[in-house]
């Protein structure tokens, strides 16, 4: 499809180029003399000149269509073969499953599900608590850094505004870990309840 579009674009370009070229010639000849313009008009031969490209267009289009059809046929054949094999493969195990494994699967499925679900639920609280615990040190480290910054600011107060700022920052930094700890305890308790 892309090749046909590309070929069509290539063919359209020379035709337009041809027309522009001939029009330029036509005006030039008209300036020279009417006889030359008349002689150049058959020399232009606008009807025959597009005809051979259109003819090749048709041939190329037919050729491309044939190629596309062949490709589609090949694709269909390739698709049909795996589909047949897949259908056969799906059909052949399904009776065996129904005969042999269906009861075993029905009996066996709930037990693995029951064992899998708590197993899935158990790691998730540990993961959440681990992430919360990992988040808590970062917040406490940030709070320590904030407190250190506040201490530095308190040690070297460049302005009178910094001392009132530092206690507010320290209060916020102190409150942040508490919030984190509350969230941690709540999440862990919720996960315990969930488990």
Swiss-Prot record:
UniProtKB keywords? Developmental protein, DNA-binding, Gap protein, Metal-binding, Nucleus, Repeat, Zinc, Zinc-finger
Annotated spans, Disordered: 16-57, 64-83, 155-195
What is the residue range of the signal peptide feature?
none
In the UniProt record, does the keyword ATP-binding occur? no
Question: Could you name the domain of life of the organism this protein comes from?
Answer: Eukaryota
Gene Ontology terms: biological process: segmentation
The name this protein carries in UniProt is Protein hunchback
Taxonomic lineage from the root: Eukaryota, Metazoa, Ecdysozoa, Arthropoda, Hexapoda
Supply the gene name: hb
């Amino acid at each position: 499809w892309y090749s046909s579009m590309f070929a069509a674009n290539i063919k359209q370009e020379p035709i337009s180029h041809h027309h522009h070229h001939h029009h330029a010639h036509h005006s030039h000849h008209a300036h020279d003399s009417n006889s030359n313009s008349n002689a150049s008009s058959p020399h232009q031969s606008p009807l025959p000149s597009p005809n051979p490209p259109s003819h090749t267009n048709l041939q190329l289009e037919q050729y491309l269509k044939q190629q596309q059809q062949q490709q589609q046929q090949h694709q269909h054949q390739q698709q049909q073969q795996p589909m047949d094999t897949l259908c056969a493969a799906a059909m052949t195990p399904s009776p065996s499953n129904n005969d042999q494994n269906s009861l075993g699967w029905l009996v066996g499925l709930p037990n693995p599900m029951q064992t899998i679900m708590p197993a899935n639920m158990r790691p998730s609280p540990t993961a959440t608590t681990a992430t919360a615990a990992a988040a808590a040190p970062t917040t406490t480290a940030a709070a320590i850094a904030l407190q250190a910054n506040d201490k530095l600011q308190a040690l070297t107060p460049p302005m009178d505004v910094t001392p009132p700022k530092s206690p507010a920052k320290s209060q916020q930094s102190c409150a942040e870990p508490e919030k984190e700890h509350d969230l941690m305890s709540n999440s862990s308790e919720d996960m315990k309840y969930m488990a």
